[in-house]
Amino acid sequence: MGGLLLAFALVVGPWLLTRYPHQGLTAEQKFKARNDVRTTLVQALAGLAVAGGLVVTYSTYRQNQRDQADRRIEQDRSHRLIEVRHVNDLYMKAVEQLGHAQAPVRLGALYSLAQLAQANLGQRQTVVDVLCAYLRMPYSLADSATPAAKEEHAQQLQVRLTAQRLLAGHLCLPRDVSAADAGRAQQRVASEDDVFWPGISLDLTGASLVDFEFAGLSVLGAVFDRAKFAASTIFTGATFFGFAGFRGASFDEEAVFDKATFAGHTDFRGATFVEAGFVSAAFHDGVWFDEAVFKVDVNLAYSRYGGYAVFSKVTFNGGAWFDMARFIDSATFEEATFSGGVSFQSDTPLDAMFNGARVLPPSDEYLESGRDADREWPPGWTVQPDEDDPNRGTLVRLQPKNPSEVMPPSSRPNAD
């Protein structure tokens, strides 16, 4: 093909392009004209050859680029597969070690899982689920009888406390991050360099938890239904961005939820407290305390309620302090029982129902001295002693509310 083009440029082309017109041209002029045409055609062919070479070179370059990209993709894929296999092997080995009879082996497994999750962002929720599952395993809070059993019990306790500390270390906000910045901390892109793990949920249903200190906890959601909290429980400044469930949970010592924020539905139905604090706690989407029991005092001063606040059939065996609490929506204390001091001091009206609420004893003079001897009910409510039992009384409204204004039935949380 190249020879034909060259022959055309050197012989045929000049002859075709110079044969007309030929009148009046000398032989020398014809020869010069053919040479000029020949030179032009050769230059054109050279240009085409250069252009073709460039096209071929570029095509070859692009093909090489595609081949290199394909090789890199395949190498990356192979590398990821190797990494995944390695991570899975480490994960399976650590999980297997959690069932080991020796406590030091179980402790090593916990730390291995935490390190694995720190370096592999996609494994964090899975590792948290494993730690929660370990804490949900049966565990007796009572001391064992024999020395050998006591030693085993003590070792098991240390393993469980380590699991709790690892969770707290990665799910509680750093000290330099305030509770007000919890939302930004949750929205931040997870990083291998950050100790805090955003986007995590907890499931500790039925778990036995000891000295559960999770001040500054920040999670999407958490379920502690039927959990048993031994010793002190600290949730100061905690933030629950989704559902928070404590249904049927029991706290055998002080439980502190001061300045905690509950952004979603919150369920404390049937929970049992010894002494509890919810000072300045915020419940944004409804809280249910139905049939909860407070064996000693509960302090809910300055707490805020953005949705329904349901305290139906709650038993307050000690003091119940709601000073300066703010209820944006309706609140109900229907059929609740108050046995100690009570205070509902507030600078804003309280829209609450106390129908059927019981007061034991009905008169403040039977209470012990001090703050527990004070009872300050919301305006419009007073205690009416029972005719049959002078040690009992019922809260009644001085000015009955219009039936059309009675709080509608409260919807329950979505978790049963």
Segments the model singles out, each with a brief description of its role:
Residues 1-52, 70, 286:
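Short hydrophobic membrane-inserting helices
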Residues 24, 49-82:
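Transmembrane signal-anchor/signal-peptide helices with a preference for the extracytoplasmic
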Residues 41-44, 58, 100:
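Alpha-helical architecture
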Residues 68-71, 77-80, 85, 89-107, ...:
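N-terminal leader/targeting and pre-domain segments
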